[in-house]
Amino acid sequence: MNRIILIGLATAILMSCNPSTQNKKEMTMEQQTVGMVEITTFKLNQGVTAKDFEQFARAMQKDFLEKQNGFIKRTLTVSEDSTWTDVVFWKDHECAENTMKLSETSKLVLPFMEKIDFNSVKMSLSTPVIIEE
């Protein structure tokens, strides 16, 4: 059951695409148009410090997330009550679906995911209406 939750959470948090395609730095402005926003809130497992989690989050973003086609940008925040909010901007929904399969088996994602309390996770996918840069 925990493995299923882990896979689902990995999929939800890391909606991205095949790493063999363009990354954000190579995308034109047209390709960087946000077509989907992923918002995930969660708490960390007991004993995981914010500092430690931030290191895993940065490593996962650098080594995995930023290399995915369709990834535009990410914001990770933490509130006073230790609720984390991960906001990821994607090119389109197709990239999100493609990453579901990829994130299930990525060894680059697992260390990040193991730090998250699965029972606290809430995730939504939304189509943006207004995005101001």
Where in the sequence are the language-model features?
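Short, surface-exposed ligand-recognition loops at beta-strand->loop->(often short) alpha-helix junctions
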Residues: 43-55
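A beta-strand edge to alpha-helix "cap/lid" segment located at domain peripheries
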Residues: 54-58, 97-98, 133
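Active-site-flanking beta-strand signature of metal-NTP-handling nucleotidyl enzymes
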Residues: 35-43, 85
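An amphipathic, aromatic/His-enriched active-site/gating alpha helix that lines ligand/cofactor pockets
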Residues: 66-72, 89-124
